[in-house]
Amino acid sequence: MRILVLSLMYPLPTNVARGTFVSDNVELLTSIGHDVKVINPLPRMLKYQEARRSTLTGVAKSPKKFKHGEIEVFAPRFWGLPGHPYPSITIRSMKKIAKKVTAWLDGWQPEIIVCHTIWPVAELANRLAKQWQIPWLSVVHGHDFDVGLQDSNI
């Protein structure tokens, strides 16, 4: 099965501990014969902004395309403001990323999309799933419950 994995959290060349729970899932899927591609949208930010959270380490200078193990990863940038005061900015950014993802996949089309984390990656998953008329599902993690459900802006 062709599976597209979308996640805000995935190991980066300079932060291999970031999002290992997602890469473990991807490795398991490939080990049982699935064809998996990974999209890791990253927020546009300056190096000093990485200090806000350990999971942001390496984001500012991460390449747009890289390999983690045997998996090719596409890491397009999106616009978003801390605290999400204007989520429409991020939603518009995800619309542009959808076009970049389609171009990067170069004719490869998934049969399903697996989305790790909800905001804002679910916006991208939903848009791509509608475009290709395929199902998508979300794997919800702690931050989605602890923070995301309480955020009145998203």
Residue ranges and their predicted role:
Residues 1-61, 66-67:
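N-terminal subdomain of nucleotide-sugar transferases
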Residues 5, 38, 75, 138-140:
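Hydrophobic residues in well-ordered beta-strands that form the structural core
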Residues 11-13, 131-152:
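A short, histidine- and acid-enriched strand-loop-helix "catalytic/donor-clamping" loop
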Residues 13, 46-48, 83, 122, ...:
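Generic structural signal for helix capping and beta-alpha/helix-loop junctions
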Residues 14-18, 85-89, 148-152:
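Short, solvent-exposed loop/turn segments at secondary-structure boundaries
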Residues 38-108:
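A conserved catalytic-core segment of Leloir-type glycosyltransferases
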Residues 54-57, 132-133, 154:
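Short, hinge-like loop/turn segments at secondary-structure boundaries
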Residues 87-98, 110-132:
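An aromatic- and histidine-rich active-site surface loop
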